[in-house]
Protein backbone atom coordinates (compact mmCIF):
# COMPACT_ATOMS: atom_id res chain seq x y z
CA UNK A 1 0.00 0.00 0.00
CA UNK A 2 1.23 3.52 -0.76
CA UNK A 3 2.32 5.54 2.25
CA UNK A 4 4.31 8.67 2.95
CA UNK A 5 6.43 9.96 5.79
CA UNK A 6 4.86 13.11 7.23
CA UNK A 7 7.11 15.27 9.37
CA UNK A 8 5.30 16.94 12.26
CA UNK A 9 7.52 19.79 13.48
CA UNK A 10 7.30 21.38 16.91
CA UNK A 11 6.62 25.11 16.94
CA UNK A 12 8.99 26.91 19.32
CA UNK A 13 7.21 28.32 22.38
CA UNK A 14 7.03 31.91 23.61
CA UNK A 15 9.34 31.28 26.59
CA UNK A 16 12.29 29.86 24.61
CA UNK A 17 15.30 30.73 26.79
CA UNK A 18 18.77 29.45 27.65
CA UNK A 19 18.88 27.99 31.14
CA UNK A 20 21.27 25.05 30.82
CA UNK A 21 18.65 22.66 32.19
CA UNK A 22 19.80 19.57 30.30
CA UNK A 23 22.86 17.92 31.88
CA UNK A 24 24.50 15.70 29.26
CA UNK A 25 23.49 18.08 26.46
CA UNK A 26 26.66 20.13 25.99
CA UNK A 27 25.13 22.88 23.84
CA UNK A 28 22.47 23.48 26.49
CA UNK A 29 25.12 23.82 29.20
CA UNK A 30 27.45 25.97 27.09
CA UNK A 31 24.80 28.60 26.24
CA UNK A 32 23.34 28.93 29.73
CA UNK A 33 22.10 32.46 30.58
CA UNK A 34 22.54 33.85 27.07
CA UNK A 35 19.79 36.14 25.79
CA UNK A 36 17.36 34.30 23.52
CA UNK A 37 15.12 35.50 20.70
CA UNK A 38 11.86 33.48 20.80
CA UNK A 39 10.43 35.24 17.74
CA UNK A 40 13.47 34.38 15.62
CA UNK A 41 13.50 30.81 16.97
CA UNK A 42 9.89 30.26 15.94
CA UNK A 43 10.47 31.79 12.51
CA UNK A 44 13.56 29.68 11.87
CA UNK A 45 11.49 26.57 12.58
CA UNK A 46 8.59 27.73 10.43
CA UNK A 47 10.93 28.46 7.53
CA UNK A 48 12.24 24.88 7.63
CA UNK A 49 8.69 23.50 7.66
CA UNK A 50 7.61 25.65 4.73
CA UNK A 51 10.73 24.99 2.64
CA UNK A 52 10.30 21.22 2.99
CA UNK A 53 6.57 21.41 2.29
CA UNK A 54 7.32 23.45 -0.86
CA UNK A 55 9.88 20.81 -1.90
CA UNK A 56 7.12 18.19 -1.87
CA UNK A 57 7.67 16.61 1.56
CA UNK A 58 4.43 16.37 3.59
CA UNK A 59 4.77 18.64 6.60
CA UNK A 60 2.63 19.48 9.63
CA UNK A 61 2.96 21.40 12.89
CA UNK A 62 2.62 20.52 16.58
CA UNK A 63 1.92 23.55 18.82
CA UNK A 64 3.88 24.58 21.93
CA UNK A 65 2.86 23.93 25.53
CA UNK A 66 1.64 26.37 28.15
CA UNK A 67 4.65 27.99 29.82
CA UNK A 68 5.33 29.06 32.55
CA UNK A 69 3.33 26.08 33.82
CA UNK A 70 1.79 27.35 37.06
CA UNK A 71 0.09 24.09 38.22
CA UNK A 72 3.50 22.47 38.84
CA UNK A 73 4.67 25.45 40.89
CA UNK A 74 1.56 25.00 43.04
CA UNK A 75 2.49 21.33 43.45
CA UNK A 76 5.86 22.53 44.71
CA UNK A 77 4.21 24.61 47.45
CA UNK A 78 3.97 28.09 45.92
CA UNK A 79 0.51 29.56 46.60
CA UNK A 80 -1.67 32.58 45.89
CA UNK A 81 -2.84 34.04 42.59
CA UNK A 82 -0.91 33.16 39.43
CA UNK A 83 0.91 36.50 39.70
CA UNK A 84 1.78 35.86 43.37
CA UNK A 85 3.06 32.38 42.53
CA UNK A 86 5.36 33.85 39.86
CA UNK A 87 6.65 36.52 42.23
CA UNK A 88 7.32 34.02 45.04
CA UNK A 89 9.14 31.46 42.91
CA UNK A 90 11.24 34.15 41.20
CA UNK A 91 12.34 35.43 44.60
CA UNK A 92 12.71 32.15 46.49
CA UNK A 93 13.70 29.53 43.88
CA UNK A 94 14.26 30.97 40.39
CA UNK A 95 15.59 27.64 39.08
CA UNK A 96 12.07 26.18 39.40
CA UNK A 97 10.67 29.07 37.39
CA UNK A 98 13.15 28.37 34.61
CA UNK A 99 12.25 24.66 34.62
CA UNK A 100 8.49 25.25 34.34
CA UNK A 101 9.11 27.83 31.59
CA UNK A 102 11.23 25.62 29.33
CA UNK A 103 10.24 25.60 25.66
CA UNK A 104 11.61 22.04 25.35
CA UNK A 105 8.31 20.63 23.96
CA UNK A 106 9.46 22.10 20.62
CA UNK A 107 11.74 19.05 20.25
CA UNK A 108 8.92 16.72 19.25
CA UNK A 109 11.29 13.89 18.35
CA UNK A 110 10.89 13.27 22.09
CA UNK A 111 7.10 13.60 22.12
CA UNK A 112 6.28 9.98 21.30
CA UNK A 113 7.34 6.78 19.53
CA UNK A 114 5.40 5.90 16.37
CA UNK A 115 4.49 2.56 14.83
CA UNK A 116 3.01 2.77 11.29
CA UNK A 117 0.02 0.58 10.50
CA UNK A 118 2.15 -1.69 8.27
CA UNK A 119 4.11 -2.76 11.37
CA UNK A 120 1.31 -3.27 13.90
CA UNK A 121 -0.71 -6.34 14.83
CA UNK A 122 -4.06 -4.49 14.67
CA UNK A 123 -3.33 -2.45 11.52
CA UNK A 124 -3.61 0.92 13.28
CA UNK A 125 -1.04 3.69 13.64
CA UNK A 126 0.16 3.68 17.25
CA UNK A 127 1.73 6.59 19.14
CA UNK A 128 3.10 6.14 22.68
CA UNK A 129 3.80 9.38 24.52
CA UNK A 130 7.31 9.58 26.06
CA UNK A 131 7.62 10.17 29.81
CA UNK A 132 10.98 12.00 29.50
CA UNK A 133 11.69 10.92 33.06
CA UNK A 134 15.38 11.86 33.16
CA UNK A 135 14.89 15.65 33.26
CA UNK A 136 12.38 17.39 35.52
CA UNK A 137 11.53 20.11 32.99
CA UNK A 138 10.81 17.52 30.29
CA UNK A 139 8.90 15.14 32.56
CA UNK A 140 6.16 17.80 32.72
CA UNK A 141 5.36 17.44 29.01
CA UNK A 142 3.57 14.08 28.74
CA UNK A 143 -0.05 15.01 29.71
CA UNK A 144 -0.31 17.96 27.30
CA UNK A 145 1.57 16.06 24.59
CA UNK A 146 -1.06 13.33 24.89
CA UNK A 147 -3.89 15.89 24.60
CA UNK A 148 -2.27 17.46 21.53
CA UNK A 149 -1.67 14.13 19.79
CA UNK A 150 -5.25 13.05 20.46
CA UNK A 151 -6.50 16.32 18.96
CA UNK A 152 -4.31 15.84 15.85
CA UNK A 153 -4.76 12.06 15.43
CA UNK A 154 -8.39 12.09 16.53
CA UNK A 155 -9.81 9.21 14.47
CA UNK A 156 -9.80 6.26 16.88
CA UNK A 157 -10.53 3.83 14.05
CA UNK A 158 -7.10 4.57 12.59
CA UNK A 159 -4.97 5.90 15.46
CA UNK A 160 -4.20 4.70 19.00
CA UNK A 161 -2.51 7.24 21.28
CA UNK A 162 -1.10 5.63 24.44
CA UNK A 163 -0.30 7.42 27.70
CA UNK A 164 3.33 7.66 28.81
CA UNK A 165 4.98 4.92 30.86
CA UNK A 166 5.10 5.34 34.67
CA UNK A 167 7.42 8.13 35.84
CA UNK A 168 10.28 6.05 37.25
CA UNK A 169 13.93 5.86 36.19
CA UNK A 170 13.62 2.16 35.32
CA UNK A 171 11.18 3.12 32.54
CA UNK A 172 12.91 6.26 31.26
CA UNK A 173 11.65 6.81 27.69
CA UNK A 174 12.77 9.56 25.30
CA UNK A 175 10.51 8.78 22.36
CA UNK A 176 11.38 8.71 18.67
CA UNK A 177 14.83 10.25 19.25
CA UNK A 178 15.91 6.73 20.25
CA UNK A 179 13.99 4.88 17.53
CA UNK A 180 14.69 4.17 13.86
CA UNK A 181 12.65 2.33 11.24
CA UNK A 182 14.32 0.58 8.31
CA UNK A 183 12.84 -1.09 5.24
CA UNK A 184 11.69 -0.62 1.67
CA UNK A 185 8.78 1.59 0.65
CA UNK A 186 7.08 3.35 3.57
CA UNK A 187 3.88 1.35 3.13
CA UNK A 188 5.65 -2.01 3.47
CA UNK A 189 6.39 -3.63 6.85
CA UNK A 190 9.63 -2.25 8.29
CA UNK A 191 12.19 -3.24 10.91
CA UNK A 192 11.95 -1.12 14.06
CA UNK A 193 15.25 -0.40 15.79
CA UNK A 194 14.84 0.65 19.43
CA UNK A 195 18.01 2.11 20.95
CA UNK A 196 18.62 2.23 24.70
CA UNK A 197 21.43 3.43 26.95
CA UNK A 198 21.06 1.16 29.98
CA UNK A 199 19.26 -1.87 31.33
CA UNK A 200 18.88 -3.46 34.74
CA UNK A 201 21.66 -5.92 35.52
CA UNK A 202 23.93 -4.65 32.74
CA UNK A 203 27.00 -2.77 33.95
CA UNK A 204 27.76 -1.44 30.46
CA UNK A 205 26.55 2.13 30.83
CA UNK A 206 27.94 5.67 30.69
CA UNK A 207 29.73 7.09 33.73
CA UNK A 208 29.86 10.84 33.10
CA UNK A 209 26.44 11.65 31.66
CA UNK A 210 23.09 9.90 32.20
CA UNK A 211 21.70 7.25 29.87
CA UNK A 212 18.16 8.53 29.49
CA UNK A 213 16.56 5.54 27.73
CA UNK A 214 16.22 2.08 29.29
CA UNK A 215 15.78 -1.20 27.50
CA UNK A 216 12.83 -1.92 29.78
CA UNK A 217 11.10 1.23 28.50
CA UNK A 218 11.84 0.40 24.86
CA UNK A 219 10.37 -3.09 25.27
CA UNK A 220 7.24 -1.67 26.91
CA UNK A 221 6.77 0.88 24.11
CA UNK A 222 7.11 -1.85 21.48
CA UNK A 223 4.37 -3.81 23.28
CA UNK A 224 2.07 -0.79 23.64
CA UNK A 225 2.54 0.07 19.97
CA UNK A 226 1.62 -3.54 19.07
CA UNK A 227 4.69 -3.86 16.87
CA UNK A 228 4.94 -7.31 15.31
CA UNK A 229 7.64 -9.05 17.43
CA UNK A 230 9.28 -10.25 14.18
CA UNK A 231 9.91 -6.61 13.25
CA UNK A 232 11.80 -5.40 16.32
CA UNK A 233 15.49 -5.11 17.18
CA UNK A 234 16.77 -3.69 20.48
CA UNK A 235 20.30 -2.26 20.43
CA UNK A 236 22.43 -0.47 22.98
CA UNK A 237 23.97 2.88 22.18
CA UNK A 238 27.71 3.06 22.78
CA UNK A 239 28.04 4.35 26.38
CA UNK A 240 31.33 6.06 25.50
CA UNK A 241 29.57 8.42 23.08
CA UNK A 242 26.85 9.22 25.64
CA UNK A 243 29.71 10.39 27.87
CA UNK A 244 30.84 12.64 25.00
CA UNK A 245 27.48 14.40 24.78
CA UNK A 246 25.41 12.06 22.57
CA UNK A 247 22.37 12.16 24.85
CA UNK A 248 19.94 10.71 22.26
CA UNK A 249 20.57 8.29 19.40
CA UNK A 250 19.46 10.94 16.90
CA UNK A 251 22.66 12.84 17.70
CA UNK A 252 24.75 9.98 16.24
CA UNK A 253 22.48 8.14 13.75
CA UNK A 254 19.57 8.75 11.36
CA UNK A 255 17.67 6.26 9.23
CA UNK A 256 15.40 6.45 6.21
CA UNK A 257 13.96 3.47 4.37
CA UNK A 258 16.87 1.09 3.66
CA UNK A 259 19.64 3.49 4.76
CA UNK A 260 21.22 3.89 8.20
CA UNK A 261 23.56 6.90 8.31
CA UNK A 262 25.58 6.72 11.51
CA UNK A 263 28.94 7.27 13.15
CA UNK A 264 31.35 4.35 13.32
CA UNK A 265 31.11 4.48 17.13
CA UNK A 266 27.33 4.95 17.47
CA UNK A 267 26.35 1.57 18.88
CA UNK A 268 27.70 -1.02 21.27
CA UNK A 269 28.62 -4.16 19.26
CA UNK A 270 28.02 -2.18 16.07
CA UNK A 271 29.31 -4.73 13.54
CA UNK A 272 26.99 -7.36 15.04
CA UNK A 273 24.00 -4.98 14.83
CA UNK A 274 24.72 -4.06 11.20
CA UNK A 275 25.06 -7.74 10.25
CA UNK A 276 21.67 -8.40 11.87
CA UNK A 277 20.11 -5.52 9.92
CA UNK A 278 21.66 -6.75 6.66
CA UNK A 279 20.13 -10.16 7.25
CA UNK A 280 16.67 -8.80 8.07
CA UNK A 281 16.22 -5.69 5.89
CA UNK A 282 16.19 -6.13 2.10
CA UNK A 283 18.71 -3.85 0.40
CA UNK A 284 20.00 -2.52 3.73
CA UNK A 285 22.79 0.04 3.39
CA UNK A 286 24.88 1.35 6.28
CA UNK A 287 26.74 4.61 5.71
CA UNK A 288 29.24 4.60 8.57
CA UNK A 289 31.27 7.75 9.12
CA UNK A 290 34.81 6.84 10.28
CA UNK A 291 36.13 8.51 13.42
CA UNK A 292 39.26 9.37 11.43
CA UNK A 293 37.14 11.64 9.19
CA UNK A 294 34.66 13.05 11.72
CA UNK A 295 35.29 12.73 15.46
CA UNK A 296 32.48 12.21 17.95
CA UNK A 297 33.27 15.68 19.31
CA UNK A 298 32.75 17.24 15.85
CA UNK A 299 29.59 15.19 15.43
CA UNK A 300 28.19 16.70 18.65
CA UNK A 301 29.25 20.28 17.89
CA UNK A 302 27.85 20.28 14.32
CA UNK A 303 24.89 17.89 14.80
CA UNK A 304 25.84 16.09 11.59
CA UNK A 305 23.53 13.16 12.42
CA UNK A 306 20.73 15.25 13.93
CA UNK A 307 19.72 15.67 10.33
CA UNK A 308 16.69 14.60 8.33
CA UNK A 309 17.11 12.00 5.61
CA UNK A 310 14.17 12.43 3.23
CA UNK A 311 13.14 10.32 0.22
CA UNK A 312 12.21 11.74 -3.16
CA UNK A 313 9.81 9.88 -5.47
CA UNK A 314 12.72 8.66 -7.62
CA UNK A 315 14.36 6.91 -4.64
CA UNK A 316 17.10 9.49 -4.15
CA UNK A 317 17.47 11.15 -0.76
CA UNK A 318 18.04 14.66 0.57
CA UNK A 319 19.98 15.28 3.79
CA UNK A 320 18.67 18.25 5.80
CA UNK A 321 21.44 19.74 7.95
CA UNK A 322 22.01 22.62 10.37
CA UNK A 323 24.21 25.50 9.21
CA UNK A 324 26.89 24.45 11.70
CA UNK A 325 27.77 21.53 9.38
CA UNK A 326 28.59 23.87 6.50
CA UNK A 327 30.72 26.05 8.78
CA UNK A 328 32.94 23.13 9.86
CA UNK A 329 35.53 22.45 7.15
CA UNK A 330 36.07 18.80 8.06
CA UNK A 331 32.37 17.91 8.29
CA UNK A 332 31.50 19.82 5.11
CA UNK A 333 34.37 18.15 3.28
CA UNK A 334 33.10 14.73 4.36
CA UNK A 335 29.55 15.59 3.25
CA UNK A 336 30.71 16.57 -0.21
CA UNK A 337 32.60 13.27 -0.50
CA UNK A 338 29.37 11.54 0.54
CA UNK A 339 27.47 13.29 -2.27
CA UNK A 340 29.99 12.06 -4.83
CA UNK A 341 29.96 8.46 -3.53
CA UNK A 342 27.65 5.62 -4.57
CA UNK A 343 24.67 5.98 -2.23
CA UNK A 344 21.12 7.38 -2.43
CA UNK A 345 22.02 10.79 -0.92
CA UNK A 346 21.98 13.25 -3.81
CA UNK A 347 21.38 16.64 -2.18
CA UNK A 348 22.34 18.59 0.95
CA UNK A 349 19.87 21.17 2.28
CA UNK A 350 21.13 23.54 4.98
CA UNK A 351 19.01 25.53 7.44
CA UNK A 352 19.85 28.20 10.00
CA UNK A 353 18.38 26.89 13.27
CA UNK A 354 20.79 28.64 15.62
CA UNK A 355 18.25 29.49 18.31
CA UNK A 356 17.29 25.82 18.70
CA UNK A 357 20.86 24.57 18.16
CA UNK A 358 22.14 26.70 21.04
CA UNK A 359 19.88 24.67 23.33
CA UNK A 360 21.02 21.39 21.76
CA UNK A 361 18.28 20.72 19.20
CA UNK A 362 18.90 20.37 15.46
CA UNK A 363 16.63 19.58 12.49
CA UNK A 364 15.83 16.03 13.64
CA UNK A 365 15.00 17.09 17.22
CA UNK A 366 12.34 19.44 15.87
CA UNK A 367 10.38 16.78 13.99
CA UNK A 368 8.30 13.68 14.69
CA UNK A 369 8.15 11.28 11.73
CA UNK A 370 4.78 9.61 11.13
CA UNK A 371 4.33 7.20 8.20
CA UNK A 372 0.74 7.43 6.93
CA UNK A 373 -1.26 5.89 4.11
CA UNK A 374 -3.39 8.25 2.00
CA UNK A 375 -6.49 7.26 3.97
CA UNK A 376 -4.72 7.84 7.30
CA UNK A 377 -3.35 11.17 6.14
CA UNK A 378 -6.89 12.31 5.30
CA UNK A 379 -7.92 11.33 8.84
CA UNK A 380 -5.35 13.66 10.47
CA UNK A 381 -6.72 17.01 11.68
CA UNK A 382 -6.26 18.98 8.40
CA UNK A 383 -5.73 22.30 10.19
CA UNK A 384 -2.18 21.29 11.24
CA UNK A 385 -0.95 20.49 7.71
CA UNK A 386 1.55 23.05 6.42
CA UNK A 387 0.60 25.12 3.37
CA UNK A 388 0.84 28.77 2.27
CA UNK A 389 -2.21 29.83 4.28
CA UNK A 390 -1.07 28.20 7.52
CA UNK A 391 2.51 29.43 7.10
CA UNK A 392 1.32 33.03 6.73
CA UNK A 393 -1.14 32.71 9.61
CA UNK A 394 1.51 31.28 11.93
CA UNK A 395 4.05 33.95 10.99
CA UNK A 396 1.48 36.66 11.72
CA UNK A 397 0.66 34.94 15.02
CA UNK A 398 4.36 34.84 15.98
CA UNK A 399 4.76 38.54 15.08
CA UNK A 400 1.79 39.40 17.25
CA UNK A 401 2.72 37.50 20.40
CA UNK A 402 6.43 36.63 20.54
CA UNK A 403 9.15 38.72 22.11
CA UNK A 404 12.45 39.23 20.31
CA UNK A 405 14.48 39.19 23.52
CA UNK A 406 14.10 37.01 26.61
CA UNK A 407 16.27 36.47 29.69
CA UNK A 408 15.71 34.28 32.74
CA UNK A 409 14.61 37.37 34.71
CA UNK A 410 11.79 38.04 32.22
CA UNK A 411 10.13 34.73 33.11
CA UNK A 412 8.74 36.31 36.30
CA UNK A 413 6.83 38.95 34.30
CA UNK A 414 3.09 38.18 34.73
CA UNK A 415 2.51 39.81 31.35
CA UNK A 416 4.53 37.00 29.71
CA UNK A 417 2.15 34.46 31.27
CA UNK A 418 -0.89 36.41 30.02
CA UNK A 419 0.62 36.83 26.53
CA UNK A 420 1.34 33.11 26.36
CA UNK A 421 -2.16 32.05 27.35
CA UNK A 422 -3.81 34.47 24.95
CA UNK A 423 -1.50 33.29 22.16
CA UNK A 424 -2.23 29.60 22.78
CA UNK A 425 -5.96 30.29 22.96
CA UNK A 426 -5.78 31.85 19.50
CA UNK A 427 -3.50 29.10 18.18
CA UNK A 428 -5.72 26.26 19.41
CA UNK A 429 -8.60 27.83 17.46
CA UNK A 430 -6.43 28.35 14.37
CA UNK A 431 -5.39 24.67 14.46
CA UNK A 432 -8.86 23.42 15.42
CA UNK A 433 -7.58 21.60 18.50
CA UNK A 434 -10.30 22.31 21.05
CA UNK A 435 -9.37 22.92 24.70
CA UNK A 436 -6.06 21.09 24.91
CA UNK A 437 -4.38 23.28 27.53
CA UNK A 438 -5.08 23.08 31.28
CA UNK A 439 -5.73 26.84 31.57
CA UNK A 440 -8.50 26.53 28.95
CA UNK A 441 -10.20 23.68 30.79
CA UNK A 442 -10.04 25.64 34.05
CA UNK A 443 -11.86 28.55 32.43
CA UNK A 444 -8.77 30.72 32.43
CA UNK A 445 -8.64 31.25 28.68
CA UNK A 446 -8.42 34.66 27.10
CA UNK A 447 -10.45 33.88 23.99
UniProtKB/Swiss-Prot annotation:
GO biological process, one term: arginine catabolic process to glutamate
Hydrolase listed as a keyword: yes
Reaction(s) catalysed by this chain's protein: N(2)-succinyl-L-arginine + 2 H2O + 2 H(+) = N(2)-succinyl-L-ornithine + 2 NH4(+) + CO2
Subunit-level organization: Homodimer.
Described purpose of this protein according to its UniProt entry: Catalyzes the hydrolysis of N(2)-succinylarginine into N(2)-succinylornithine, ammonia and CO(2).
Pathway as given in its UniProt record: Amino-acid degradation; L-arginine degradation via AST pathway; L-glutamate and succinate from L-arginine: step 2/5
Pfam families on file: AstB (PF04996)
Name recorded for this polypeptide: N-succinylarginine dihydrolase
Induction: By nitrogen starvation, and arginine. Induced at stationary phase via sigma S.
Keyword check for Hydrolase: yes
Active-site residues (renumbered): 174, 248, 365
InterPro entries reported for this sequence: AstB_sf, SuccinylArg_d-Hdrlase_AstB
UniProt KW keywords: Arginine metabolism, Hydrolase, Stress response
Organism per entry: Escherichia coli (strain K12)
Binding residues annotated for substrate, in chain numbering: 19-28, 110, 137-138, 212, 250, 359
EC code(s) of this entry: 3.5.3.23
Amino acid sequence: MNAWEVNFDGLVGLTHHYAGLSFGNEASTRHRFQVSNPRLAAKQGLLKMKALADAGFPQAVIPPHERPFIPVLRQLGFSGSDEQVLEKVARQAPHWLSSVSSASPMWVANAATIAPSADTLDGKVHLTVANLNNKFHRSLEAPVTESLLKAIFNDEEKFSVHSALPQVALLGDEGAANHNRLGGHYGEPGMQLFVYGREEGNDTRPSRYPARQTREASEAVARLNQVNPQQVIFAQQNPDVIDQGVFHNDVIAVSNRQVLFCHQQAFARQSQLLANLRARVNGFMAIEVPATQVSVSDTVSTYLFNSQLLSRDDGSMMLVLPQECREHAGVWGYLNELLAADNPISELKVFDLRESMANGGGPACLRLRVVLTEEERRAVNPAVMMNDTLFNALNDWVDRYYRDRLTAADLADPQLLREGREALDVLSQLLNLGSVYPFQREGGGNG
